């Protein structure tokens, strides 16, 4: 009988733990049920959407319902304060592409599950944390919304489910979420064609054309291409840190860990003020930018502190000597020049016509449609009006 004792004890401890979880309830004063109804917010928000603020708030972050159309609301975290009179930006979304309607509900019940449901009761999104020991919900100062147990352990966190944005301290991780996906357009909150993907051997940007089942890689972050043959990426985290003890400068970087080393960091920019309230975003057009919020000012609190693809190279005196990931030309953006696609020095090349003249570029520029690939379908156009010297 002695040999069965460890197994019996293990089973007994398991059931005791399960019983403990079943009796752990969220205190009544911590539960809530919000209905998506009533007045809309008065201040300007990103994508010019309407919004309704909810009670969960930790400066400068607040949980909200927001929309661009009256019947399609997204549950999201907003970053920004009213007193700065600056644009409020959306840094996390629960239900992108699966909106809820007026009178939808957000419920945090005694069982510890956070549930977003439409007005007819249909569940649109949830944390799936029912009866797992959750005792509370809070938004941390870094913008991470968490559900935690009686010991303070996070049983669910918004940092584990990024959409197109990484806040400071947020990561892409192998075995979890490994990519950011762009938004389709300012007025359409569904997944767009661009993605920032962490793969075993690098961090890459991809574009998914509507005409192809396979995404096209259009950029690779340089430092991550130097991994040894026998190591692979495990995580990439957006971070800030003091450059020195005096706190005169702050570094924004992408830190990474690998399978057999501590990893390293790709420094993106060096800023002269505290950049804790920053986020990295994959933009609608496929660019990558960092936005930094200065909560110490009353106006113009937002600043773009990094742009991967620039219209023109920055002046030499503005180039950060600390940066290891330099900016590139906008010509690398897949749809910079529409379907015609010819770009030089961040400028779209004019459109040649069958009659000869080259017209100024416009969004309607596109290559001619060929009926076949036969030699008869190819010819040169004579360009008149040129003077040779």
UniProtKB/Swiss-Prot annotation:
GO molecular function: carbohydrate binding
Record has Secreted as a keyword: yes
Biological process per Gene Ontology, one example term: water transport
Places the protein is found: Secreted
Pfam family, one: B_lectin
Summary of the tissues where the protein is detected: In 14-day old seedlings, expressed in the epidermis and apical dome of the shoot and in the hypocotyl, cotyledon and epidermis of the root. In developing seeds, expressed in both the inner and outer epidermis of the integument.
GO cellular component: extracellular region; plant-type cell wall
Main location: secreted
CDD domains tied to this protein: B_lectin
Glycosylation sites: 29, 103, 230, 235, 274
Protein name: Epidermis-specific secreted glycoprotein EP1
